[in-house]
Regions:
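Short, structured motif recognition centered on aromatic/hydrophobic residues
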Residues: 8-12, 26, 31, 43, ...
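Vicinal oxygen chelate
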Residues: 7, 15-20, 38, 67-151, 195-196, 244-255, ...
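N-terminal beta-strand motif that seeds the catalytic metal site of vicinal oxygen chelate
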Residues: 1-20, 65-66, 124-166, 179, ...
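Intrinsically disordered, low-complexity, positively biased terminal segments
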Residues: 2, 19, 51, 59, ...
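Residue-level detector of conserved, well-ordered beta-strand and adjacent loop positions
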Residues: 44, 56, 103, 198, ...
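Short, charged/polar, Gly/Pro-enriched secondary-structure boundary elements
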Residues: 48-53, 107-111, 118-120, 202-208
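Core segments of cupin and vicinal oxygen chelate
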Residues: 4-50, 160-208
Length: 255
């Protein structure tokens, strides 16, 4: 039985030597500054979450870890009993709240958080879909997509590469209560090379996955995903970032 069942991904935590450069990129990407200190940058989406991306200032650029929302404050005390876990502690950062810090099998930090400050949602104008059929038929209305980035709504999922996929997935399921949505294997079912996992929120519908672990020779962050209002935003913002000529395209549309 899992120690607790987290409800959702809260944020990704990174380190970088230049907070100005990070803020510029993340703003181009569609995030909005929630807070900034001399040593850290906190970026938000349009949903009420105080922040969904944290960058700590450091000499080296690297991935620190992921944070997840606890289902209750009592769950912090429960997960603090996990091997190697910190005590329940106050978060001395913008947004406040409490947390427990853990290390997953590849050494990355996992935070379980509760009681963070919520912000007012940022209003975003939505263009209704044009189906050619009432009531969604936009007769006589010209559609123009904005040239600036579409504001990101929320953080979606995080993906880790790991040499030991089964061990990593077992830790997340036993500790945070994830449920397997789809597993990928080669040959035998015990030769697991990828695993999509979702939060266990009972009868409440959740995303297909909040965590994906994929086999890789070295452990590391593969990507973090963010939700935008519609597919137009995915393609349009991909072109917007490409036109800036400042960033390296990684893979597909949107990365």
């Amino acid at each position: 039985m899992a120690l607790i069942k987290v409800r959702d991904l809260a944020w990704a935590r990174m380190r970088a030597p230049d907070l100005d450069a990070m803020e510029e990129f993340l703003t181009h990407f569609g995030l909005t500054r929630a807070a900034r200190t001399p040593t850290a940058l906190y970026m938000r989406g349009t949903d009420p979450a105080h922040h969904i991306h944290v960058t700590e200032k450091a000499d080296d650029a690297r991935f620190v870890g992921l944070a997840y929302h606890a289902a209750s404050e009592d769950d912090l005390a429960r997960v603090a009993k996990a091997p190697g876990a910190s005590a329940v502690e106050s978060i001395d950062e913008p947004g406040g709240g409490k947390r427990v810090r853990l290390r997953e099998p590849n050494g990355y930090q996992i935070e379980v958080v509760w009681g963070l400050q919520a912000l007012a949602p940022i209003p975003v104008a939505h263009t209704p879909m044009n189906t050619g059929v009432e009531p969604l038929r936009r007769a006589g209305t010209l559609m123009r997509l904005r040239k600036s980035p579409t504001p990101i709504k929320r953080i979606g999922h995080g993906v880790l590469g790991a040499p030991k996929v089964s061990e990593t997935v077992r830790w997340f399921r036993d500790t945070l209560g994830f449920i397997g949505s789809d597993d990928i294997y080669v040959g035998q079912k015990d030769h697991l090379i990828g695993s999509f996992n979702r939060c266990d929120c009972g009868d409440e519908y959740v995303d297909h996955h909040v965590f994906f672990c994929v086999m890789n020779e070295r452990a590391g962050l593969n990507h973090v995903s963010f939700e935008v209002p519609d597919v137009d935003a995915v393609f349009k913002d991909h072109e917007y970032i490409a036109r800036l000529g400042k960033y390296e395209h990684m893979w597909g549309v949107g990365r």
